Amino acid sequence: MNLRDACVEAAREVIAQEGIEHLSLRDVARRLGVSHQAPYRHFPTREHLLAEVMHRCYAQFAEHLQDRPSSSDPHADLHALGELYLDFALSHPLEYRLMFSTPWPQAAEQAELTADANQAFDTLRRVMARVHGVKSPTPAVDLDALFVWSTMHGLAGILSANCTTHLTLSPTVHKKAVAHVMGLIGRGLSHPAC
């Protein structure tokens, strides 16, 4: 592993173990056993390092969302996408938090972050365009995509924070939550309000 990649991995460890507020290039260097100046060859500031960590999280997320076979049924594809979203949130909590709960760093790499975030969102937009029966996104497609995203984000937040463990919900409810939510979304999209 080269020093740049090692710095990114060490940064992820710092964030996971101590929190993002404790991330520093000096701590990364100490963890790697290199001089305090070594990480600066690849990352001029802490913000640049954080931007690279987030960039890799978004790339991993986009790849995860695209890791599904496309079918001829856009509603089935939307359902699968919802399951993949939740699966990523629960199986990669650090990356999920970094993408959706961390203010974006003001670094030169912010353009890459924007491209990565759009790549992940475009996966949803393309499926939503198919649900709408159009070839490219329209304002209605984007509104519905934001609705689906915010719904899945809310469910992911509730489940990842274990908010439901203290409720008297049966294991069946937990098991069927995603399918139920995606079913309601599908019905709502079949009968749009506007």
Residue ranges and their predicted role:
Residues A107-T114, N118, V131-M182, P192-C194:
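Hydrophobic/aromatic-rich alpha-helical bundle segments in the mid-to-C-terminal region
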